[in-house]
A protein has these predicted regions:
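Mid-chain, well-packed structural core segment of small domains
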Residues: 106-136
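Transmembrane beta-barrel strands of outer-membrane/channel proteins
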Residues: 48-52, 68, 79-85, 99, ...
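Solvent-exposed loop/turn segments connecting transmembrane beta-strands
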Residues: 52-62, 83-94, 121-128, 158-166
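Repeated loop/turn-to-beta-strand initiation elements of outer-membrane beta-barrel proteins
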Residues: 73-78, 105-108, 143-149
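Outer-membrane beta-barrel "beta-signal"
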Residues: 164-178
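Cleavable N-terminal export/targeting peptides
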Residues: 1-39, 178
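Helix-rich interaction surfaces within compact, conserved domain-sized segments
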Residues: 128-141, 146-154
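Residues on the lipid-exposed face of transmembrane beta-strands in outer-membrane beta-barrel proteins
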Residues: 64-70, 95-101, 112-114, 135-139, ...
Length: 178
């Protein structure tokens, strides 16, 4: 700390102000980045969803979805598991990863999952193994609940000769769990 003597004719209050102006700035400790500082406080979420299965084809059905998104692992990546069913008795159990990108109150979430599919009386997707690529846009309320729209594509990625794929548009409500 560097200070210069002040003349005695300057009042003490002005002397203190002048001394603080000419002091050398204090050194700050170096910034340390750890895994903990890269984490956010996003909770786990339970999502309930309903929508329209096979929106681009003639075998449409109602879609219902239950999904558990775990707390962030790191860099805004969430692992998740889910179960989707349709009014045609198709069932899809899956697990994957999602990435939250927040812009104000809106959350954009691309995700990818793999799982097992049973067609029931619905559309034959060609293989039991199916992959899901999705984009969700949600509004996050002050209490951290989210209301969002998700569009996703299911496909077996040509694991079988028959690979018609399907698209789903669904509305979801996500409830936070700390």
């Amino acid at each position: 700390q560097l200070a210069f003597p002040m003349p005695t004719s300057i009042p003490a209050s002005k002397s203190a102000a002048a001394t603080s102006i000419i002091r050398a700035p204090a050194k700050k400790p170096p910034v340390q980045v750890s895994q903990a500082s890269l984490r956010s406080d996003d909770p786990s979420y339970l999502t309930l969803g309903a929508g329209y299965y096979d929106i681009n084809d003639n075998q449409g059905a109602a879609e219902f979805r239950l999904e558990w998104r775990f707390k962030e692992m790191f860099w805004k990546i969430h692992p998740f598991v889910g179960l989707m069913g349709t009014s045609d008795a198709a069932v899809y159990g899956y697990g994957g990863i999602a990435f939250d990108w927040k812009l104000g109150k809106f959350v954009f979430t691309p995700s990818f999952a793999a799982g097992a599919y049973r067609d029931g009386d619905g559309k034959d997707l060609g293989h039991v193994i199916e992959f899901r690529s999705a984009l969700e846009i949600a509004y996050e309320f002050d209490n951290r609940h989210r209301l969002g729209l998700i569009f996703y594509h299911l496909s077996n990625a040509s694991l079988a000769d028959n690979n018609p794929g399907t698209e789903v548009l669904s509305l979801g409500y996500s409830i936070p769990f700390d």
